[in-house]
Amino acid sequence: MEFTLIKQDGAARRGTVSLAHGDVQTPAFMPVGTYGAVKSLSPVEVRDTGAHILLGNTFHLWLRPGLEVIGEFGGLHRFMGWNGPILTDSGGFQVWSLGDLRKITEEGVRFRSPINGDSCFLTPEESMRIQKVLNSDIVMIFDECTPYPATPADARDSMLLSLRWAARSKAAHQGNPNALFGIIQGGMYEDLRDESLAGLTEIGFDGYAIGGLSVGEPKEDMLRILAHTTPKMPQDKPRYLMGVGTPEDLVAAVSHGVDMFDCVMPTRNARNGWLFTRHGDIKLKNARHRKDTRPLDEHCQCYTCLNFSRAYLHHLHRSGEILGARLNTIHNLHYYQELMLGMRQAIEQGRFEAFATEFRQGRQMLQQSA
């Protein structure tokens, strides 16, 4: 893996991450393909939205269809028909989300499979083995996602466990030519975030992620940790903010120097009839859209906006038609990718601050009427 920093405008960064299956232009947004598919779309449709890289879910793919199946295809790319780069998470967040169904020890995490109830044991070494079979371009270390809220003592214990697991992940990754990213933990405590980052950089990784945010904390806490942590991350490595977020979150994070993002928000909201536009959000369930002949966004060039009205999308949503979820997903992902493209161009032109101001002003236009 190679990271090239092309231009910096303030703290905002424009770069390229060169990976085994292609280049990723940053700032970049990764659509989430939990089970090896971005929900409701084909790989061609996902690429047509402007996506360069996808995220796959190690935990779920390990449980189903399993490594024996994916291994027959030489990895996830051929199995799912996507020839671009793939990042896989380590399974740590999914195990954390099981709550009382899992038991964490120094060695790893024991839990019951949510599919069939089988006893499973996931360790840093096993996570690295799984991700090697998946042949993902970017592998994430196995970590513990610090819960929110957490006392300083609990957050520190969790962070230190993640650091020990990070070292084990690095050792187990030896022999895998793909990139390995470390994950900064530490809850809502700046000093713990600093300690985590220092420990990870001492171990040494190809890129660094900010984990443990967007887990229920107030937005101001998320932004506080983001503003504190990002500037201290290595300048010559990609910076990845995990599981975030709204369009506003993405612009704010890029302003602090984040390069990569993933989030289920554009796809999940699309299936729930919640659409993002440059003028604000549209909720298709609202009756005001029943006879609206306009597209979602008159300036959007996605397939949905070029061919269908708000009235038709409202009808599909109210009728529960699968086509509605597909068209909505195409639009939301296209919107996110166009937002990333706009930020890349603004950084190149040295006008990111003006872009961010125009973005915020535009997004407020529909707040009262959507």
Swiss-Prot record:
Cofactor(s) listed: Zn(2+)
Subunit annotation: Homodimer. Within each dimer, one monomer is responsible for RNA recognition and catalysis, while the other monomer binds to the replacement base PreQ1.
NCBIfam families noted in UniProt: Q_tRNA_tgt, tgt_general
Pathway: tRNA modification; tRNA-queuosine biosynthesis
E.C. number(s) listed in UniProt: 2.4.2.29
Active site location: D89 (proton acceptor), D262 (nucleophile)
Cofactor: how and how many bound: Binds 1 zinc ion per subunit.
Keywords annotated in UniProt: Glycosyltransferase, Metal-binding, Queuosine biosynthesis, Transferase, tRNA processing, Zinc
Alphabetized GO MF terms: metal ion binding; tRNA-guanosine(34) queuine transglycosylase activity
UniProt superkingdom: Bacteria
GO biological process: queuosine biosynthetic process; tRNA wobble guanine modification; tRNA-guanine transglycosylation
Enzyme class name: transferase
Entry binding sites for substrate: D89, S90, G91, G92, F93, D143, Q185, G212
A Pfam cross-reference name: TGT
An annotated GO cellular component: cytosol
Catalytic activity from the UniProt record: 7-aminomethyl-7-carbaguanine + guanosine(34) in tRNA = 7-aminomethyl-7-carbaguanosine(34) in tRNA + guanine
Name of the featured protein: Queuine tRNA-ribosyltransferase
RNA binding: annotated span: 243-249, 267-271
Annotated family: Belongs to the queuine tRNA-ribosyltransferase family.
